[in-house]
């Protein structure tokens, strides 16, 4: 294995470790997929996990500045096809290999920024947040699963979005107490 291949593999394995440490259920889900999809999905999870950590964890930091830097670094990694941040390097490998649309990444990062700006959500913001925080993550994974078959991607796009939205709503229910008590957030409109 040459040096760049070793670096690429190591960064992908970092994302696998992040997934294993942060989500045993997601790790188990990934293991049900064909082996060829494991590392790409770990890379997507590593990216979304770190963005989520910025908005949910680093309370003594300027979260907006951290998220802005993460966003800038993400796009630089994708464009230059390299990053010294192992999570972003692994993610850019998958974005570039599977041609993941930048608008999906932008929608995701926008939803992360919404967590900094909104504490309660009306119907419109609720659906906007779910699209960016969950549906687009499913669409990124769908790009991997379809391996460039655009017709198959379009056929499965709507069901993938519905599945992502359902998972997010379950997460909202699971975390309703901590979201409110620790972060002051209420995602469900009218609650």
Residue ranges of model-derived segments:
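Acidic catalytic motifs of isoprenoid enzymes
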Residues: 1-191
């Amino acid at each position: 294995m040459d040096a760049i291949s070793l670096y690429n593999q190591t960064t992908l394995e970092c994302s696998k470790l992040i997934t294993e440490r942060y989500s045993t259920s997601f790790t188990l889900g990934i293991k049900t997929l064909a082996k060829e999809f494991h590392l790409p999905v770990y890379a997507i999870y590593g990216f979304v996990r770190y963005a989520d950590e910025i908005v949910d964890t680093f309370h003594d930091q300027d979260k907006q500045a951290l998220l802005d830097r993460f966003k800038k670094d993400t796009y630089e990694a994708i464009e230059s096809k390299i990053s010294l941040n192992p999570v972003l390097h692994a993610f850019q490998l998958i974005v570039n290999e599977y041609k993941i649309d930048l608008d999906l990444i932008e929608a995701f990062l926008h939803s992360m920024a919404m967590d900094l700006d909104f504490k309660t959500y009306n119907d419109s913001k609720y659906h906007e947040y779910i699209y960016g925080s969950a549906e687009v993550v499913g669409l990124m994974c769908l790009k991997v699963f379809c391996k460039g078959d655009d017709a198959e991607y379009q056929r499965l796009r709507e069901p993938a979005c519905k599945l992502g939205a359902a998972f997010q709503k379950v997460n909202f229910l699971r975390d309703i107490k901590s979201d409110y008590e620790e972060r002051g957030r209420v995602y469900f409109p009218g609650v």
